UniProtKB/Swiss-Prot annotation:
It is an enzyme of class 2 (transferase). Gene3D superfamilies: Aldolase class I. GO terms for biological process: biotin biosynthetic process. It catalyses: (4R,5S)-dethiobiotin + (sulfur carrier)-SH + 2 reduced [2Fe-2S]-[ferredoxin] + 2 S-adenosyl-L-methionine = (sulfur carrier)-H + biotin + 2 5'-deoxyadenosine + 2 L-methionine + 2 oxidized [2Fe-2S]-[ferredoxin]. This is Biotin synthase. The keyword DNA damage does not apply. Coiled coil: none annotated. The lineage of its organism: Bacteria, Thermotogati, Deinococcota, Deinococci, Thermales. Its cofactor is [4Fe-4S] cluster; [2Fe-2S] cluster. Its EC number is 2.8.1.6. Pathway: Cofactor biosynthesis; biotin biosynthesis; biotin from 7,8-diaminononanoate: step 2/2.
Amino acid sequence: MAWPDLDPPRLAERPLSLQEALFVLEAPPEALPALAEAAIRVKEYFFGRRLKLVRLLNVKSGFCPEDCAYCAQSARSQAAIARYPLLSLEEILERAEEAQRLSARRFCLVAALRGPTPKVLERLGEAAQAIKARFPLELCASLGLLEEGMAEALKAAGFDYYNHNLNTAPSLYPRIATTHTYQDRLWTLKRAREAGLKLCSGVILGMGEGPKEVYEMALALRELGVESLPVNFLLPIPGTPLGDGRTVAGLTPERALKALILFRLLNPKAELRASAGRERYLGPYEPLAFRMVNSIFLQGYLTQPGSPWERDRALWESLDLDVEEGACG
């Protein structure tokens, strides 16, 4: 087929069709530079050259009753990770100060749970109020499934975003988790939206999906209108059901970059984040990825290490990207 129309305003008005998306995902190597430049143009049209730095904090580790196949903290996991109970208010504030020193713009508080307990809501509510009083940080909570009133409590405490990833396509979801459904995740995002929280929701690539499922994920997130969209690449963790790495065997740097390009083109106004696994899978294309995304995670993920801060800083400085600063609006 002929090249699709990749004009930024047009992409904002009408999503790519499945056929156009497959053109991107199945493009030959010689087309990759032009596709990457198109994605970069989209990013710069809507956001300029800004890059937002995001820091994660696992406020409790392990002991999750859910059975997500990718997760080292799940009920099915035998992974050798640190397991600890809910951090104290003082520990959370110390880590917020560290995030501020690292030039982070957003601080994400994460707990592996089916949903937040009253104790978790109280502790993180206190933390949010204290952080907002001291640091110019955007705040995001990721605490599992939300019941009535929980999103409102988080919003009132000062949280700006709620993260709840869709992770994969609906047709593949039963392979990934059985203790909750894809629809449960959609309901949680709906509750967060109704409470006035901005939505952070994304995917984990490398869990057995094909090109059509990648398109399905990117289109679903567009239809939800998510403000923040993390694209993760599976880090197989020994001791988890996906720990043997069989599902990522074909995830080459070219395929990883083309997937990121598609998420950019289908979600031109979303804050796209190159998330877990970018260091491993993007390889020589990581500089291109930095130019087409809005944000990156700093210094690792929930249970896995990431890129050193100094390395990432050298990369964004070499690309002349503008790191976001200032009080959150």
